[in-house]
Amino acid sequence: MANIVFKLSDKDITTLMSRISFDTENLPQGMKARAKYQNTTVNIYQSGKVMFQGNHAEAVSEELLPQHSQLNTNKTKKKNMANSFLEQTLMYDQFNCIGSDEAGSGDYFGPLTVCAAFVTKEHVPILKTLGVDDSKKLTDTKIVELAEQLVTFIPHSLLTLHNEKYNIQQAKGWTQVKMKAALHNEAIKNVLEKIDSSQLDYIVIDQFAKREVYSHYALSDIPLPKKTKFETKGESKSLAIAVASIISRYAFVTYMDQISKNINMTIPKGAGAKVDVIAAKIIKKYGLSRLDTISKKHFKNREKAQKILKPL
């Protein structure tokens, strides 16, 4: 199935929407309008990007956006030439892969989020056009923009371990490695239920532990062990991992924004000195028990925040 993306001005989007009938209600977050036309899905996003999906995507885009279609084709050819070496080095992008990654493990505040995503060879050009990259290189704003588009067409599973449950499991002796292994394995199994596994070439996990350690903590067997690979710096080696990273980071960032609104403070990410100061302010205003509902209790920040409040 072909996927073609354009970046349009508000004027061009208005013109496009006047040419065929679009639905504008009950749409996923981040989507402005959607239409079905000649066996092709046309998605218009709030970001100004328009995606054509389907076997006739190219023909439909040429019909509805004749001028832009030709410009986009020329740009794509140039970009493909520039990326030719990159495509040779990214082996996994030549195959249909499930990638998995997590967010929040190094942050005192907020949950642990894990995503697994299925990316096919056909998805690769559209993902590159959208600008999918290592989430650590992307701003939070860009992550939100990308994720809201990705979740509309990439089969995925997103799991969130909220702080209260996280702290309960940690108190029982669960390490972060055990939590992540269990969540990654569950997310991967969820995605396998959504796809035809005969089309799957590899499962690529952004490595946080060696295979034997992962297998020990995963709570259940690795679904397809012969197809499963563990890669350090996986986001730079597999677009499937990059997509999973963006979606998991999106969930984490969104939750952090919600925490900030709920307590009327800007909650910093990470586990540095700024985090200690904000944690101390939360204890002073709301109490230690409230702090524990939005943070990971075993981090040293909790102790440091309490020391800040002690009189000199």
From Swiss-Prot:
Q: One MF term from GO for this chain?
A: RNA binding
Q: Which residues bind a divalent metal cation?
A: D101, E102, D206
**Alphabetic keyword roster:** Cytoplasm, Endonuclease, Hydrolase, Magnesium, Metal-binding, Nuclease
Subcellular locations according to the entry:
Cytoplasm
Q: Organism's domain of life?
A: Bacteria
> Where do the coiled-coil regions begin and end?
none
Catalyzed reactions per annotation: Endonucleolytic cleavage to 5'-phosphomonoester
The record describes how the cofactor is bound as:
Manganese or magnesium. Binds 1 divalent metal ion per monomer in the absence of substrate. May bind a second metal ion after substrate binding.
Q: Which EC numbers does the record give? A: 3.1.26.4
What the protein does comes down to: Endonuclease that specifically degrades the RNA of RNA-DNA hybrids.
UniProt record similarity statement: Belongs to the RNase HII family. RnhC subfamily.
* Name by which UniProt lists this protein: Ribonuclease HIII
Q: Which organism is it from?
A: Staphylococcus aureus (strain NCTC 8325 / PS 47)
| Taxonomic lineage of the native organism | Bacteria, Bacillati, Bacillota, Bacilli, Bacillales
